[in-house]
């Protein structure tokens, strides 16, 4: 998670993760993750230092829509479990991708996607959904030019003094 802090530190409104937050994320998400959908890039010339990572999860969106009333019990939890354990969805969510600044524009993203896309095909995912990204972050926006991609959602925040 040190890579997360280093990678995102210059993004608008990003707050460094504390040790407590890191522990919480590891216990809540990483322990439940399918490690085939998590990848890392190491620099063998720098003592196998981790320089980039990618974390993805099967999308729970369709399962939660199917539940409809929002109740996990008595049977809603089974739909969520099918996604978590058996990947019964056609969409994967790209949760986090991070590359240390000194390794950007050197192919680290390509290595991340080369590994992850192979796993996505193996699991039968047809779509990948990226989490919100700043439109002004040209570094992250430019990576999509090499893939068949479509921006179909925009998030906006507005301020108004009351």
Segments from the language model and where they lie:
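Conserved beta-strand-loop-alpha-helix junction that forms the acyl-donor binding cleft
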Residues: 99-104, 130-140
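Conserved catalytic-core motifs of GNAT/GCN5-like acyltransferases
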Residues: 129-131, 145-161
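Conserved structured core elements
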Residues: 16-23, 106-111, 138, 152
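Short conserved micro-motifs at the rims of enzyme active sites and ligand-binding pockets
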Residues: 65-67, 104-107, 141
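Conserved GNAT acetyl-CoA-binding A-motif
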Residues: 91-92, 120-134
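Conserved acetyl-CoA-binding loop-helix of GNAT-fold acetyltransferases
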Residues: 91-99, 104-120, 146
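A conserved beta-strand-loop-helix scaffold within acyl/acetyltransferase catalytic domains
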Residues: 1-98
């Amino acid at each position: 998670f040190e890579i997360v802090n280093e990678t995102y530190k210059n993004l608008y409104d990003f707050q460094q993760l504390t040790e407590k937050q890191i522990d919480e994320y590891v216990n809540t998400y990483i322990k439940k993750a399918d490690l085939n959908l998590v990848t890392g890039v190491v620099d063998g010339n720098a003592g196998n230092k981790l320089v980039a990572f990618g974390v993805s999860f099967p999308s729970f969106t369709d399962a939660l829509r199917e539940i409809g009333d929002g109740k996990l019990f008595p049977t809603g939890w089974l739909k969520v479990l099918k996604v978590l354990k058996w990947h019964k969805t056609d969409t994967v969510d790209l949760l986090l991708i991070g590359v240390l600044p000194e390794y950007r524009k050197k192919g680290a993203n390509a290595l991340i996607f080369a590994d992850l896309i192979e796993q996505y095909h193996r699991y039968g995912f047809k779509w990948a959904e990226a989490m919100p990204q700043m439109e002004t972050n040209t570094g992250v926006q430019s990576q999509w030019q090499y893939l068949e991609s479509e921006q179909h959602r925009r998030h906006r925040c507005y301020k108004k003094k009351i």
